Structure formats: structure tokens, C-alpha cells
Amino acid sequence: MVDKCLFKLSDQFPEHTAGFHVDLGLKPYGSYNSSKWSPVRFNRVLTNVGNGYDQKTGVFTAPFSGLYIFHLHFIGGLHKQKTELAIFAGGEAMAVAYADGYDVDTNDQGACTAVVDLVMGEKASVKIYFGNPLLWASNLVSFSGVLIHSD
């Protein structure tokens, strides 16, 4: 009876786990400049289960095939210019976040989420999609991803 219960319980958890959470660091002021179409290299890695995120390149490589969820949050719109960042996966923009600084202050927030089916070895990253490449360089700019179901 105990063996049956343990077997059923083990079926409830995925065989593979992978996830990461990265940001642009703890420095409260300053800016991060990235060229358009180049991955943003998040310099502080808070979590990297499965070692899929490469801090040197800013690219996540899927360690397992399956369904992933990615989330991006950023402060942009510096100097009253709009900024668009995109979550790229499998070679295309899956979600785009927008921020501008046209309101009272000169900063704005953008966020987006993408649910993507990746094959082991496929890549995901954040890239400047349009506009001003300056980002607020702090822990307020973050990117994360989690394997929610493995194939």
C-alpha cells in the first residue's frame, strides 16, 4: 500500500526541473546600455537550477524539452524616450514590453510574460526590440524562466 502511494505521489512531480531568476544588480542608480538585437546580459544570477542561464551571454539554453514560462520586468523610458524589450525564444519575439518616460517623471515600467514550448538546446533571451537602449541598472530590471512541464 505504501509503495502504491509513493508511486502515485512521484507521478505528481516532474522528472526534470529548471528555472532561473536574474537581474541587473543592486546598484541603485545608473544605466545599462545594450545594442539593439543583442541579448541583455543580466549580471546578477539569483537562481539557476539546471544551469541553463549563461551570465556571459545573457542567453538561457533549455536543458530539457518542455513548456517554459518566462517573465520580464524593467524600468525604461529614460530621458523621455520609449523603450521596448522583447522575450525572444526559438529565434522569434514571443512577447514585447513597453515603457516610456513621457509622464511626470522620466521613468516607466514595462513587463511581459511568454509561455513557450522549447526543445532541449533552444534558446531564450531578452533583447532591445525598439527605442532607447538605456535601462535602469538595478534589481528593478529582471528576467526569469521556469520549466512548467517537461516532455
Predicted regions mapped to residue ranges:
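Extracellular jelly-roll beta-sandwich "head" domains, especially the C-terminal globular C1q domain
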Residues: M1-D151
